[in-house]
Every structure is written in structure tokens, then in C-alpha cells.
Amino acid sequence: NSPALAASETGSALLAAEDVALRSGHPASVVRLAGIYGPGRNRLIEQARAGMNVPAEPAQYTNRIHRDDAAGLLAHLLAQAEQRELLAPCYLGVDDEPAPLHEVVGWLQQQLGVSAQADGPGSTRMGSKRCSNALARESGWVPQYPSYREGYAALLD
């Protein structure tokens, strides 16, 4: 439960919007969705296919959520609110498994039958976070795709 820190203007704007919602005097909860992937959102698959090369050290932990799980979490929380259930101020919309980017890309490349290329595109990702969906799960939400493996496998079939 570390506090959210904004590393960009966009992040600052999002935190300010969350603050406005939570201090509005109206019932509100914030849902922070991690990297959304799914049908039509295949950027990492395309980067892996192009030979993306991600060093193992230092590990860049990433969090993601399948599009269907993101929608399912929102629907679940809205249904709870409709039943007058008390919601937490903030939920993290992530799958069960924060993973190092090199592991995710390596797994995708293995599934695609391609290899990382020495001159392939590199990661421009900054930061490294391990987020937990424990609070969302405690509310009764269960992701259909608990890790990147199940989610991306469904896209690659």
C-alpha cells in the first residue's frame, strides 16, 4: 500500500482527478488500471514479434490486465455499489502476477517462435512496480486471465 507518486504531468493530472472524485462529498472509488491488453491492443505482441530485446537486469517489473478483466472488474464494482456495498477508496486493476518485462517478452517470443534480436527494439519503459489486486479479489472479483500467460495465450490462439 505505497502512496501513488506521479512521475509525469499526466500522472499528476490523474492523481488530481482522483482527489477531486474522492473529496467530492459523493460516494466514489478510484480504479487504477494497469497496462490494458486484449483484442486490438497488441502492442507488446508486435514488439516481441519484431525481436524486442529487454535486458534481464535490472528487472523492470510490469503489471497488466486483460481488457475483459478490466471491464469485468468495473462491472463487479458497479454491481456492488448498486447493492449499497461499501467500496474501498481505491482498487488496482491488475492481474495476479506482476512480472519482469523480459520474462513476459521472452514468453511471448517463445510462443511466437521468434527470438530477441541484438539490434531489435529496446524497452523505453521507465519505472518498476509490483502492484497487487488483493483488495479487488477481497471484494469477490476473480480475473478470467490471472496472469499474462493465460491472457496472451487467448490472443495468440
Question: What do the predicted segments below correspond to?
Answer:
Residues 47-57, 114-118:
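A short C-terminal helix-loop "cap" of Rossmann-like NAD(P)-dependent dehydrogenase/epimerase domains
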Residues 30, 64, 98, 130-131:
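Short aromatic/basic micro-patch
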Residues 1-6, 36-40:
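Conserved catalytic-site region of short-chain dehydrogenase/reductase
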Residues 5-29:
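Active-site Tyr-X1-5-Lys
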Residues 71-73, 80-127:
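Mid/C-terminal beta-alpha module of Rossmann-like enzyme folds, strongest
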Residues 14-18, 42, 98, 102, ...:
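Short, surface-exposed alpha-helical segments at coil->helix boundaries
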Residues 13, 30-36, 43-46, 56-78:
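Substrate-positioning beta->alpha
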Residues 124-157:
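C-terminal amphipathic/interface module of NAD(P)-dependent oxidoreductases
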